[in-house]
Amino acid sequence: MSFKKIIAIVLSVLILLSLLIFGFVRYLDTNRDIIISEAKIATGVDSQMLPIKVTNFFPKNTEKISAWISWRNAKINTQLLVKWHYVTDDIPIYDYSLTIPKKEGVANVVLAMPEGKSLPSGLYKVDILLGKKRLIKTLTFEIQ
């Protein structure tokens, strides 16, 4: 077999593999129950449910943190699980189940301390899962 034929076969196989992989990734992307278009950590939300003071760093004595989530192309009644975790001491804090009510929208999940108390200093993360297993997004933040 000539060198040109070997190169042609190798290139054909590579092109075929690329098409198969691209097609599979595209299939996975179009067959989701939901697409998280944005997810942000903020101090809260305004009257239009938009995040206020988006940041990943919060001062000492912070009492409340918001995890704001925007989605699209959702199947109605899709279940999300929002898991708050104190990374510094590896402590799970709070799990919140969210049932998606419409194809497109936003949600705000709040972690708040009782009045007069503040969240401990350290590193935190928020995992957003489809159902209880499939991780969709992780957000991180720090309290000084």
What positions do the PLM features span?
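Short, low-complexity patches enriched in S/T/P/G
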Residues: 1-7
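Sequence-pattern detector for short linear motifs
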Residues: 7-8, 29
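Hydrophobic membrane-insertion alpha-helices, especially the h-region
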Residues: 9-22
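Contiguous segments within soluble domain cores/interaction surfaces
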Residues: 25-121, 127-137
